[in-house]
Amino acid sequence: MYYSFFEIFSIGVGPSSSHTVGPMRAAKRYIDNLHKKELFDKVERVEATLYGSLALTGFGHGTVKAIVYGFMGLEAEAIDPEKPYVSAVERDKILHLGQERPIPFDIEKDVIFEKQTFLPEHSNGMRFRAYDRDGNVLLDEVYFSVGGGTIARQDEISRRVEREPYKVPFDYSSAAELLEICEKEGLSIADVVLINEAALRPHDEVMEGIGKIHRVMQASIDRGMKAKGTLPGGLNIERRAHEIYCRLEQKFRDNDYDPLLMIDWINLWGFAVAEE
């Protein structure tokens, strides 16, 4: 079954699709549901409970940061990496719910870690609750981050079904089938993918989406190569990308043209993006 380019490549907050991208989307969807149910204006406090795997790695894998982003109603594409969103919430203990309403929010109290509790449906579980001024629960929802940034609410996960296959000119389910198509049609892999994507959405939209992902990836590489110090998350892990970058730049200045040097540059770009 064919998977769209945009299902495999998407813009999200790192470092993990299941521990950051998924929780951010879940928290954002929860805020959207408050709006849909006309409860948003009654909210005086929100609370997040992390279960199992998310609780065990919450700070180190950026889950808490991601949930704060989601509660703020932020989309991954709109986040400015230079802005201290979470540190401002930690300092002021104020969260701008859905980018609209400032409410009290203390990360140490309003994000709860249930490290010993694994929900039966999936190890990456989270519960969101909103309260009114009298302490009554307005909306209580449980979500799961099931991998690749995909989320499911508790009432949805038990009835998840595979989507209908996309109708594309060149369907394939393995690399061997893809290469066979390329040889038969005289097309490159990129040609096949582009033709398929253009069957799912307008060509201009495809190219714009690819360009946006490329720009974000390039910006992540550039920032990651220049950043120094320790990684966020409280684990005190030193960044490596900048050191590798300086070493490779020195080799370039010394005219050290090792044919395997390109592999080192590719590894550097991987480190740079991972550390961003």
Locations of the language-model features?
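N-terminal amphipathic, basic-rich helices that act as targeting or association modules
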Residues: 174-220, 224
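Conserved phosphate/anionic-ligand binding catalytic regions in large, soluble enzymes, centered on
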Residues: 9-27, 60, 276
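Generic secondary-structure signature for well-ordered alpha-helical cores
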Residues: 32-39, 72-77, 133-136, 215-227, ...
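Short, hydrophobic/aliphatic alpha-helical segments
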Residues: 1-12, 47-50, 263-276
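Accessory "access/gating" subregions that flank catalytic or transport cores
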Residues: 204-276
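Flexible, glycine/charged-enriched surface loops at secondary-structure junctions
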Residues: 38-45, 78-81, 224-237
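Beta-sandwich/jelly-roll carbohydrate-recognition scaffolds of carbohydrate-active enzymes
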Residues: 41, 46-192
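N-terminal ordered "arm"
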Residues: 16-45
